[in-house]
Design a protein with these regions (language model features):
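Extended substrate-binding grooves/exosites of carbohydrate-active enzymes
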Residues: 71-72, 110, 123, 131, ...
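Structural beta-strand segments of beta-rich domains
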Residues: 53, 157-165, 584-588
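Solvent-exposed, conformationally flexible loop/turn segments
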Residues: 37, 96-97, 158, 197-201, ...
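Short strand-edge motifs at loop-to-beta-strand transitions and within beta-strands
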Residues: 40-42, 81-85, 200-206, 622-626, ...
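Core beta-strand residues in small-molecule sensory/regulatory alpha/beta domains
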Residues: 67, 182, 227-229, 255, ...
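An acidic-aromatic loop/edge-strand motif
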Residues: 1-30, 78-79, 89-161, 169-175, ...
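Extended acidic/polar, glycine-enriched regions
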Residues: 92-96, 164-248
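Accessory beta-strand-rich segments of carbohydrate-active enzymes
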Residues: 16-19, 30-137, 168-171, 184-185, ...
Length: 639
């Protein structure tokens, strides 16, 4: 590949990793050629009959600046966000014919902690409107009530769906909005019409009988059709896939459709491994399919606004989503990161609106994700340095309040790695969902310092391994390095700030007030090669449960055993080709959903091991959960 250790070489101390002195980091952002400037040019064709137009970018890396027919139509700072630009004036009121579009992008060094990609890596849409139309992103469908939920939590006797939208019209007289809900067989199950009066907005409640409820196990989607009419003339039609489902967070935990459950989630970076950062539907579907087979039911879009296609696929396939926004606010984690823009008010761009970038980005995040059934929570930040300060509390309140105004149906969280500082500043208590990044030893303190009645493992584990690589002696360690730049796949290596999966599971399973976890990470990703941040040519992560190609590491079977105990899982490690280890003891681990296992080597039994349930006190002394080990690690098992 086009890897070069000089690309974005950074001499820095990674503060969130606890580093005090700056050292050379060659692989932090993937060593791929993403830095520089680029231009895109294309021709669009506008047919007759339209008077208003927009270009909608699902994301462009980075700082996209757009011209149409040589006229500046706008700029956006954040390369991960969705944004819309009005091109009506630049196209002469949507004059029929061909129009030239030019897009300038730039990526500067030290602007990312991982590989961000470069260029137009998500779709761009041309959206055309007639004289009167439904305002883009104004349609908002939310489940207001679900009654008579069946025992399987897949259906309900009745549900109410509230739908609001805003029409762009010069006069209200005679204008109406019809909301129609169709089932998967295209049958009309609910329909209501409201006439516009003094307002351009409508609020319509649809009553749905015998409703099919959306969940990861039953990802049922309806089609919502919004029509703007004037007499017998239809001005605009907007369609959206929506799910009917009920979510709640309380001292009784997280409930979906009335059923308490814990998130079995993973964090995902936006790249697709060897395919890079350009979004690919088939590749993402494959990722979701792989994760679901492991028992995963949720993803966290770490640490950025998700691609709209991600949410569409998660709706269809049944995967809950924590929709994240930022990796930093005012205080930079890297020299030229988003902190350059966070508080900045754009005073120059033609699409400026007088608001700081954080507010514009949060607004677009909510408006573009709130109709998706899979979206069950927003995250306003990851390991934000300000979390321990009064300033952090101020911005936490501002962002959470903004989200509540735009979408009062979902809670907010942020991943807090300095939890004690966040408890001191009040940020911990402020968030709808208090989120721990690691720090399992503080879970009890966090629970007692919040009136919410629950805590979330917003980021957990950070166990590292290389697929198919085994190191000796086999021992639990934190960040141990080897001369070949690999990490042992015995699944006993965590980072200095983190822990093994077993530690998380004990809290998840034993404490009803822990509502789930999001493991770092589901798949390996480009950049951030901890624990080999200073080792060339290491340039991609070791955190993944699956590797860059989506192939399972041993940990995938460990998580499958824990998250899908009803499935039949039996996995033995390591491989058994050990030239040079003749006569030495080679530990064997078995990950299985069965209650016990017997190991045979060349037909000779090595003994039978049985799982056992343990108390928290016993666990802290001697972990016994999903692993059945033979050999020198036998102290971890119940013989």
């Amino acid at each position: 590949g086009p890897f070069d250790k000089e690309i974005d070489k950074q001499v820095v101390a990674i503060e969130q990793n606890g580093e005090k002195e700056a050292t050379e980091k060659t692989g932090r952002s993937g060593c791929l050629p993403w830095i520089g400037e680029g231009w895109y040019r294309t021709i669009i064709t506008i047919p007759e009959g339209y008077s208003n137009g927009e270009l909608i970018f699902d994301g462009a890396m980075a700082e996209p600046h757009v011209w149409v027919n040589g006229e500046d139509v706008g700029y956006w700072a954040y390369g991960y966000n969705v944004f819309a630009l009005d091109i009506t004036h630049a196209t002469g009121g949507c004059k029929p014919g061909k129009h030239a579009v030019a897009v300038h992008l730039q990526n500067v060094e030290e602007s990312s902690r991982w590989y961000p990609g470069a260029g137009i890596y998500r779709p761009v849409r041309l959206v055309l409107h007639k004289e009167k139309y439904i305002k883009t992103w104004s349609n908002f469908a939310r489940t207001m009530m679900v009654g008579g939920i069946a025992s399987d939590h897949a259906t309900a006797a009745e549900a109410r769906l509230r739908v609001s939208c805003e029409a762009v019209v010069s006069k209200h007289d005679g204008m109406s909005v019809t909301q129609t809900l169709r089932d998967a067989s295209n049958n009309i199950v609910a329909q209501e019409t409201h006439y516009l009066s003094d307002s351009k907005t409508t609020d319509i409640t649809l009553a749905v009988k015998n409703a099919e409820l959306w969940s990861p196990e039953h990802p049922y989607l309806y089609t919502l059709v919004t029509e703007l009419k004037e007499g017998g003339k239809t001005w605009d039609v907007v369609e959206a896939k929506v799910g009917v489902r009920d979510i709640s967070y309380s001292a009784e935990g997280f409930k979906l459709n009335g059923e308490a459950r814990k998130f079995k989630g993973v964090c995902l970076h936006h790249d697709l491994g060897p395919l890079g950062a350009a979004f690919n539907k088939a590749a993402f579907r494959r990722q979701i399919s792989i994760l679901k087979d492991m028992g995963c039911d949720a993803i966290r879009t770490s640490h950025n606004v998700p691609a709209p296609w991600q949410l569409e696929i998660c709706d269809e396939m049944g995967m809950m989503v924590m929709a994240e926004s930022f990796d930093m606010w005012k205080y930079p984690k890297c020299k030229n990161g988003y902190a350059r823009f966070f508080e900045q008010v754009d005073t120059e761009s033609v699409n400026r609106d007088g608001k700081p970038w954080w507010e514009r980005d949060i607004t677009n995040l909510v408006l573009t994700t709130r109709n998706h059934a899979c979206n069950i929570m927003y995250s306003i930040g990851n390991e934000i340095p300000e979390q321990s300060s009064a300033e952090g509390l101020k911005y936490s309140k501002l962002m959470q309040e903004l989200i509540h105004r735009l979408d009062g149906t979902r809670p907010c969280t942020q991943g807090m790695d300095k939890a004690e500082g966040a408890m001191w500043s009040g940020v911990w208590q402020e968030m709808d969902v208090p989120g721990f990044n690691y720090r399992v030893h503080l879970y009890d303190k966090g629970y007692k310092n919040s009136a919410k009645g629950y805590v979330l493992g917003s980021e957990t584990a950070s166990t590292v391994s290389s697929r198919g690589v085994y190191k000796f002696p086999v021992e639990e360690n934190h960040g141990k390095q080897y001369s070949d730049g690999q990490v042992s796949s015995y699944d006993l290596t965590a980072c200095w700030w983190s822990n093994l999966p077993d530690d998380d599971w004990m809290w998840q399973d034993k404490m009803p007030w822990v509502i789930g976890e999001f493991v770092w990470t589901g798949f390996d990703y480009l950049g951030e090669p901890t624990p080999y941040d200073e080792y060339w040519p290491s340039r991609s992560s070791y955190f993944g449960i699956y590797d860059l190609a989506g192939l399972p590491k041993d940990r995938a079977y460990l998580y499958r055993v824990h998250w899908r105990p009803e499935a039949k899982t039996l996995h033995v490690l390591p491989h058994w080709t050990w030239k040079g280890r003749e006569g030495e003891v080679t530990p064997v681990f078995v990950y299985t959903s069965y209650p016990e296992a017997e190991l045979f080597i060349n037909g000779k039994s090595q003994g039978r091991l049985k799982k056992m349930d343990v108390s928290m006190a016993d666990f802290l002394e001697n972990r016994v959960e999903e692993r059945l080990p033979w050999g020198e690690m036998g102290k971890f098992a119940d013989p």
